[in-house]
Amino acid sequence: MSHTNKIAYVLNNDTEETASPSSVGCFDKKQLTKLLIHTLKELGYDSAANQLLLESGGYQNESNHIQTFFKLIKTGQFHLINWQIVCSLPLAHSSPLRSEWLQRLLIPTPTPATTSLFDHMLLQLQYLQQLMSSVNSSTCSDAEIATLRNYVEIMILVNRQIFLEFFHPVTNSASHKGPHTALPVLYLRKILKNFIEIWDSLLVSNDQFLNEENIFNPETTLRELSTYLTNPKLTAQLNLERDHLIDAISKYIDPNELVPKGRLLHLLKQAIKYQQSQDIFNIIDPDDDASFSSPPHRINLLQDNFSHDLTVTFQEWKTIQDTTDEIWFLTFSPNGKYLASATSESSRGYFITVYDVEQDFKIYKTCVSLSQSVLYLMFSPDSRYLVACPFSEDVTIYDMNATSLPDASATDSFLLYPSTRLSPMDSFKLDTTTYPDDTESSASSSSRPANANSNQSRVWCCDAFHTAERAGWMVVGSPDREAIVHSLTTKESLFSLKGRTCIALGHDENISGRKSIDPAKVLYKPTSSNGNWQYVEDDETFPRVHDVKISYDDKYVLLMTHQGVIDVYDFSGFPSKEELSKQTVDPKNFLIPRIARLDVGKNMTCISLPLNTTHQGFHRQQISESQHLVLVSLQDNELQMWDYKENILIQKYFGQKQQHFIIRSCFAYGNKLVMSGSEDGKIYIWDRIRGNLVSVLSGHSTVMSNSTKPMGKNCNVVASNPADKEMFASGGDDGKIKIWKISRN
């Protein structure tokens, strides 16, 4: 017997194999076999896959129903696709359709051979329309509606393909130049549009069965198909479009009935990413698949993949030094186009420099007419306006789209580039006498502004609302115990939190000794989380506000106070611009609930929210895993990460030096990193989740300027570019702005 035959004999007569269990460890043997067969076919080993199929007893990768359905698509026999075939597909995470629904959809109607495809699909649409008359969300479960919606989506995908194939006519005659425009237009209007309208009506809010990977937007789909009418050349090759249709429908199918495309490779990627995640020097970036797609890089599948090297590097890319004054504040615009810089007091005057990031950081605007040093800068969400909060009582606003006008008579002739001179478009002060809560008690020595001889409050911080409903609004905070909602467009103060707040308590919290508040007087939007809240009077003196942040969905306003706490207010019920314009709600007659208080207990210098990478105008996108995080810089050589909604301290970061000055920190690299300046001139970078220090950069050093004033070596501020996760900037006492780049090894 030859060696080969011996191997075959042993394999065929292995008693251990015949008596083998139905599982291998915790894995199902049938699933493993199906996965191997599927992968062999994807790799082109069809004969080996067929041999394994025979030896395993015929484990099919897809059921007969699925094979029949996909064959109809590949051969273009769409006139044979009906609700009976579609509803026979086994869907993932779905419940069976009601029997009475199936009876209405699966009406046996033999279609004559002469019936057109248009009439056939019109009949399927009519069956669905008849069914929808009995579908009611109040009597049907979300799971039932989700199943019906998935089948409707599959039928829409099929009809979309039918529509596209109008632009690939069968060339029965040489004179045929292309499709008649009337038929695609009619099909889109009479069939596809009605299918999509029904699908839209089946959407369930907060649907736990909604698969984000599979749904498509009806408005986008209609716009896309309408584009094909005007430019039919956009359609791809016929076979390629049918393959895409099969791939799209495959995502709806139960994986136990159809092995997902590339499943084994996907599992291997997950395993390698998990192995790499165990290394504390690995910066996890789920969006980065470069290591799996780079041809020169080969991953060894025969051993574990660990690396003890830092997976990202930080490189100093550019140094800007247009001043010898200390850099106090840096901020990128939301669209990443501008970088604004504010300096300390200067013998040349006070101004803000705005750099054009896209033009190699050339000076774009020099904002003038400031009477004192600027403590805080903020760009509006559309990146058009820059708001400056100086030491003085004036909040100054600049329009980045305005034309720069040199002024020979101006006192700021010291400017390096007079052609970039930009005057304010507006400025305002907070008048503390205009609010009714300035009672004798609130104006006592403990709460009176430090500049008590003035009726205006200083403004040291601000942040803008982000959604379209509150576009042009911002919250300004004052160390003189004020926080006010101000409109940039109408140039008026809309609401003062001082004296207009209450405290929200859970149903299990003790309210004894507290004065209850009628919920009708509270501005809040009822949800499942606040349905059991009780509201009590807030009898505390309004705090001194040193920093303010607004969540990207505009639901929460965070005030960092001088008292060592961060107060979180629920603004979800605050009226929109439309409601205020119609005067349906007067917010001055209501209270804003404080839903949380983060008891940090130490002196804080700034707070930061995660970066929002969507920057095209106004938006509602949330930031998934990190949407309720706030980073706190402490004057105690420490940073803290809190979940402000749950009032939980999540992580602490140590290493940087901060005891005497305001040092600012930020999120970076798609919110995977946390970074901060330091009083030793260095930049400290941590892994956001683990809290370990991953790098320390030598950023800024002690220098002596041309003046007699000695310069410190603080790195006062770091700022990330929200439109380019690989870019951040730092500013220090040496007057330098350094631009840094992050790259993966």
UniProtKB/Swiss-Prot annotation:
Present with 1200 molecules/cell in log phase SD medium. SMART domains: WD40 (SM00320). One of its GO terms (biological process) is negative regulation of gluconeogenesis. One of its GO terms (cellular component) is cytoplasm. Residues 441-454 have a biased composition (Low complexity). Identified in the GID/CTLH complex. In the absence of stress, the complex exists as an inactive anticipatory complex (GID(Ant)), composed of VID30/GID1, the E3 ubiquitin-ligase RMD5/GID2, VID28/GID5, GID8, and the RING-like subunit FYV10/GID9, awaiting a substrate receptor to form the active E3 ligase complex. When cells are shifted to glucose-containing medium, the substrate receptor VID24/GID4 is induced and becomes part of the complex, named GID(SR4). It comes from Saccharomyces cerevisiae (strain ATCC 204508 / S288c) (Baker's yeast). Keywords: Cytoplasm, Nucleus, Repeat, Ubl conjugation pathway, WD repeat. Belongs to the GID7 family. It holds the Pfam family WD40. This is GID complex subunit 7. PROSITE patterns: WD_REPEATS_2, WD_REPEATS_REGION. It is found in: Nucleus; Cytoplasm. InterPro entries: WD40/YVTN_repeat-like_dom_sf (IPR015943), WD40_repeat_dom_sf (IPR036322), WD40_rpt (IPR001680), WD_repeat-ST_regulator (IPR051350). Transmembrane segments: none annotated. SUPFAM superfamilies: WD40 repeat-like. Component of the GID E3 ligase complex recruiting N termini and catalyzing ubiquitination of proteins targeted for degradation. GID E3 is regulated through assembly with interchangeable N-degron-binding substrate receptors induced by distinct environmental perturbations. Required for the adaptation to the presence of glucose in the growth medium; mediates in association with the substrate receptor VID24/GID4 the degradation of enzymes involved in gluconeogenesis when cells are shifted to glucose-containing medium. Residues 433-454 are annotated as: Disordered. WD repeats lie at residues 322-365, 369-408, 445-487, 540-579, 613-652, 657-696, 710-745.
